[in-house]
Every structure is written in C-alpha cells, then in structure tokens.
Design a protein with these regions (language model features):
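Feature 926 captures the class I aminoacyl-tRNA synthetase adenylation module centered on the KMSKS loop
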Residues: 1-146
Length: 146
C-alpha cells in the first residue's frame, strides 16, 4: 500500500517529513495497463507482442517513448494474485489521483502531521523538483518526501 511505501521510505531515509507528494500515472499509462492486463488474462505474456499491439493503438502509442514501462507493468501484473488481476480488469480505468486525494489526505495529516499533495504525471503545474512523476505507474504511484 502507499502508506506502507511511505513508512518504508521514512524508515530507510530517517527523515522527518515536512511534505509528502504522490504522483499518479498519466492517462495513456492507465490505458496501456488495462491493455497489458487483458493480454495477461488472455494468456499473452510476450513483451514484444504486447508492445506491438500497444504501438498499433492510438491511445497507447506513446509507449514508444517508454518501452521499459511495459516490462515493469508486466512484472507488476504477474506478481499479483489472479483474483486481484481479475478484479482490476472488472473495475477498468480508475481516477487514481481522485481516490488517493480523498482516501489519504486526512490519514497522512493524522499519521505524519504534514500536508499531502497529489499530482497526475501530466499536471502542467505539478511540483516535481526530483522528476519523480515520470516513474509513476498505474497502482504504483511515485512518492516524494521532503
């Protein structure tokens, strides 16, 4: 979970947080995730074939700029239990930014006594001094703690 990730970062870095920022993946990555997930559920795990199908689709052709995303996402999906995969397929695309903002803002405030900022990777005015947003993947947001 995101809270576990925050706790692990704090444990490793031993910093006392002043601000926590979470970056969610941009829209095309969510579409690509769902396409990769569908491929896996249909038995297709060949990265080359998956990349080819993503590039052929107008909504996910941006994968050309980040082919490593497919490998990481495929590994994410394959490491998850089958039931979770099926559940995510049923749900389809979600607004991670909205969900994280509504579910974690007060929790972070209570647990760490700091503000939580949530940005989409594609937000033009996002605060991202360490260029973390680009590493965000669906269900695997990037985290910056200052």
């Amino acid at each position: 979970s995101i809270i576990d990730d925050i706790n692990n970062i704090l444990k490793v870095t031993k910093i006392s947080p002043k601000k926590i920022i979470i970056y969610t993946a941009e829209q095309w990555k969510s579409k690509a995730y769902n396409s990769i997930l569908k491929n896996v559920l249909d038995g297709q795990t060949n990265i080359g074939a998956i990349i080819k199908s993503l590039i052929a689709n107008k909504e996910t052709e941006q994968i050309k700029k980040d082919p490593d995303f497919v490998k990481k996402t495929l590994n994410d999906i394959l490491s998850e239990p089958t039931e979770l995969r099926k559940g995510r397929m049923k749900v389809g695309e979600i607004d991670e930014k909205k969900i994280i903002s509504s579910e974690l803002t007060s929790l972070v405030k209570n647990d760490y006594n700091v503000e939580l900022d949530v940005f989409s990777e594609s937000d033009v005015n996002k605060y991202d001094p360490k260029n973390k947003a680009r590493s965000a993947r669906p269900f695997k947001p990037a985290i910056l703690i200052e």
